[in-house]
Amino acid sequence: MSQIKKEMLEIYKPYSNMDWMNYKLVKSDVTLHHIIKKENGGNKCISNLSLIMPNAHQYLHLIEYKDIETYNTINKIFKYVNQQGYEPTIEQREIIEYLLKQFESEHKWDKGSKGKLIIKRKYLERIYK
């Protein structure tokens, strides 16, 4: 595990056992999402990173492709989480969950280039209720 992941896990102390998008957190598998993308000048520093699982990371970039407003709103919440210095609050988790459900409602029948639905079952397996 990288030093920056260890530092983030120590700072944000995920007592909820959820990543920042409400998926079950497996510390050894967690990924770092750049809030401001590297290609847009975003640094690999704690204030520009969020802790999300690989499925969540893949899903977040699908959301970026299909609905940039939702993507930007989720990233704004991630910025607030970094400013507060602890894992997302219940209210922040509820907003993220609402945004994800809205996206799923609007795009549940969208298909990719191979004719398969773009919202995979694994994207719906969040643990926040």
Give a label for each model feature:
Residues 1-23, 42-43, 47:
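Short, charged surface segments at domain edges that flank catalytic/cofactor-binding sites
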Residues 7, 11, 73-80, 95-102:
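Charge-rich, solvent-exposed alpha-helical interaction surfaces
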Residues 18-20, 29-37:
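Histidine-centered catalytic micro-motifs used for acid/base chemistry in nuclease
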Residues 21-26, 56:
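Short Cys/His-rich metal-coordination motifs, predominantly Zn2+-binding knuckles/fingers
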Residues 24-31, 61:
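Short functional micro-motifs and their immediate structural scaffolds
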Residues 35-41, 68-77:
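Short cysteine/histidine-rich metal-coordination sites, predominantly Zn2+-binding motifs
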Residues 49-72:
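Short Cys/His-centered divalent metal-binding micro-motifs
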Residues 84-129:
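Short flanking/linker segments adjacent to small metal-binding domains or redox-active Cys/His motifs
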